[in-house]
């Protein structure tokens, strides 16, 4: 039997945390990720059989009882994960009463899951209600998207339209648009609850002046969603450096045509068609 460190989940998470760091989306200890794993993805490994520690969650996650999550650690630097996954990552199982996380692997130096873990689990709960295949929550700090939260109205319709119009790919990748919450203190249950409420409708939620919470069926899909959103924000920033005057754009009619061609349904009321 092989070790869990050799699992596809650990290898992929090491790859993407390093890539996200290199893009300056996860400076210092910024950013966190959690991945729901099926029992079949865990139980084949010999070193995940015993509970090593039990950690309080701080809220009721009973609807996730028995679920496994691979999660990044609190205070950990994404740039280090690929070299020391046994310290910076942890595999936990949600206890039967939903109040605790049972550590099965990782965090070997006494570490704990990210301080945003409650927020992650709240979003996992909401996304699973609308998509039973949902698995990933990824939080990072995309530079150009954060900048938009200083210069643009924090209105979901406005920001979704702005990002859709920057490239033809946007409306295909996130046809529901992008959610926004007010600025809130990170790490609190309150920000987790506000984000989870938006996750019922959107797979990506802006935390103004802070970053992005994104969700998806796999690490690749979720990271790709972030890439497309940040690319659109980057194009808008580049337009600004060229004088900011837009001479031609993707029209609402053209956005609707793109969505129809790819069998996507844009968020109701976001297009003027």
Predicted regions and their residues:
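Glycine-rich flexible loops
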Residues: 1-273
């Amino acid at each position: 039997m092989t070790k869990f460190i050799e699992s596809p989940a650990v290898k992929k998470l090491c790859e993407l945390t390093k890539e996200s760091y290199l893009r300056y989306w996860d400076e210092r200890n910024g950013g966190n990720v959690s991945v729901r794993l099926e029992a079949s993805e865990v139980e084949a490994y010999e070193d995940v059989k015993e509970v090593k520690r039990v950690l309080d969650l701080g809220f009721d996650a009973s609807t996730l009882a028995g679920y496994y999550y691979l999660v990044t650690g609190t205070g950990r630097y994404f740039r280090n994960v690929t070299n020391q996954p046994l310290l910076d990552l942890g595999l936990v199982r949600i206890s039967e009463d939903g109040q605790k996380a049972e550590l099965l692997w990782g965090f070997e130096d006494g570490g704990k899951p990210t301080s945003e873990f409650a927020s992650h689990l709240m979003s996992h709960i909401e996304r699973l209600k609308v998509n039973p295949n949902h698995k990933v929550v990824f939080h990072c700090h995309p530079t150009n998207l954060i900048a938009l939260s200083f210069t643009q109205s924090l209105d979901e319709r406005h920001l979704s339209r702005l990002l859709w119009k920057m490239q033809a790919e946007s409306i295909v990748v996130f046809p529901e648009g992008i959610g926004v919450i007010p600025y809130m203190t990170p790490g609190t249950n309150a920000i987790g609850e506000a984000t989870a409420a938006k996750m019922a409708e959107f797979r990506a939620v802006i935390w103004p002046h802070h970053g992005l919470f994104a969700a998806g069926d796999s690490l690749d899909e979720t990271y790709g969603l972030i890439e497309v959103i940040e690319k659109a924000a980057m194009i808008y920033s580049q337009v600004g450096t060229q004088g900011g005057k837009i001479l031609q754009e993707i029209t609402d009619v053209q956005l609707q045509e793109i969505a129809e061609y790819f069998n996507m349904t844009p968020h109701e009321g976001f297009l003027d068609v």
